[in-house]
Amino acid sequence: HTTGLSAGTSIIGKFVLKLDPKFLSKCNKYIDTKINVTGTNGKTTTAGLISHLIEGSGKSVVNNAMGANMLTGVVNALSVSLNPFKKTDYSVIESDEAYLSKIYDKFDADYLLVTNLFRDQLDRYGELETTKRLIQDGINKKPNLKLVLNADDPLVASFEGENKTFYGVENVYYADESLKANTSTEEAFNCPCGKPLMYSKKFYAQQGHYFCTCGYKRPEPKYKAEISLYKEYSVIKVNDENFEVPLVGLFNAYNALGAIALCKELGIENIIDTLPTFKVAFGRSEVKYLNGKHTLIQLIKNPIGANEVLKTVDKDSNILIVINDNYADGRDVSWLWDAEFEFLKNTKHEIVVSGIRANDMALRLKYAGVEKIKIINDIT
C-alpha cells in the first residue's frame, strides 16, 4: 500500500512473491468461493460482470479488475484487496490461459468459466491446441472444479471435467442491419472422429450449432439465450428472463451470457436489476467524454475480436487506431492481415494510426481499400 500502486499492476506481486513464495496458498483461507475466468477474448469484461453481479447481491468480492492476469498480477490484486481480519465471500480472478495451471498449483478453485478459444498471440502460445492443453492441465489439477463452458465453441465445449455446465445462444436478432455485417474470417475445426464439423447455425467465427455425421454435436446448454442486438446495448433472454446489457456487440452479449450463467449457478440474486448498471473496465467498450466529445474505446488483439469490434464502428465518427507490440500485446502483428479492416474503407473522416506499429497499421488500411489521403500516421 505504501507504494501507491493499484491492483492493476504486477509490481507489488513480484515483491510479495519474493518476500513470501507461499503467499497465494495462504490466501485460500480468507476466501469462501473462488472463481476463475479464462479464454482468448472477453476475460476482463466477463470477470468484471461477475464481480458486479456478486456485489449487487450484497456479497463481498476481490478481483483483478484491471486485467493483470498472470501470476504476479493475481498476487498483486489479492495482496492489496484481501482483508486478513474478515473472510471475503468470493474471489473473481481473470486468468491468462498460459498461467492458469501455475495459479492452480497454489490457489484453490471452485468454478472456472471459459469464454472462447481463438488464434491469439502466436508468438506466446503457438497453435490453439497448445492453448487448450495449457487450460486442460490446470483443470486436471482440480478434480472437484465446476466448469461453466461456452457450448457454442467446439474447442471450449470439449474440455474434460467431472462437473460441466453449458451456456449457449439459440438465436440472434439485429435491430439494425448495419450490425449484421458478415466476415470471411472463420475458424474450421474437426470432430474428434477426424471429419470437419458442420453447422446448422453459425453466429461468428466458430461459435454456433455444430454437429458431425458420426453423431457428435454441440452439447445441450442449461442456459439458452435469445439475443437482441441494438446499437448501444443488447437484450438477452435466458430461460424466460430478460436481461438488459449496457454493452455493444455480439461478443459482449456472449460475455454477459457467461456471467449470467455462472452467477445463476452461484445462486446470486438481483441479476436483472444489477446488470444494467455495469461499468466496463478500461478499453473494453469504455465510453469517455474527451473535451466534451463522446468517445468509445475498444480493445483489439486478434482477428476474430477485431472483426467483432469493427462491425460496431460508426463510419461517421473520427477513428484512432493504436497498435503496439509489447510482450503483453503480442509481438507478432501479422494478425492485422487476417482482420477485416475493409469494414473501414467507406468511413467519412480520416483514420489516425498510432503506436509502435503505426506504419504496419497504415499499410494494412491501404490494402483494405482506405484512400491514402484518409490515412494519417504522423500526428506530431
Task: Please name every model-derived segment.
Residues I50, I54, V74-L78, A256-L266, ...:
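Buried hydrophobic packing segments
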Residues A281, L299-N377:
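Active-site beta-alpha connecting loops in nucleotide-dependent enzymes
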Residues T44-H52, E226-D240:
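Acidic-glycine-rich active-site phosphate/pyrophosphate-binding loop
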Residues S228-K231, L262-I300:
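Gly/charged, well-structured mid-domain segments that form the phosphate/adenylate-handling core
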Residues H1-G168, Y173-F189:
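Phosphate-binding loop of NTP-binding sites
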Residues T88-S91, P143-L147, K293-T295, N346-V352:
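Short active-site oxyanion
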Residues V169-V235, P246:
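Cys/His-rich short segments
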Residues K106-R119, Q206-E220, E244-P276:
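A conserved, hydrophobic alpha-helical segment in the catalytic core
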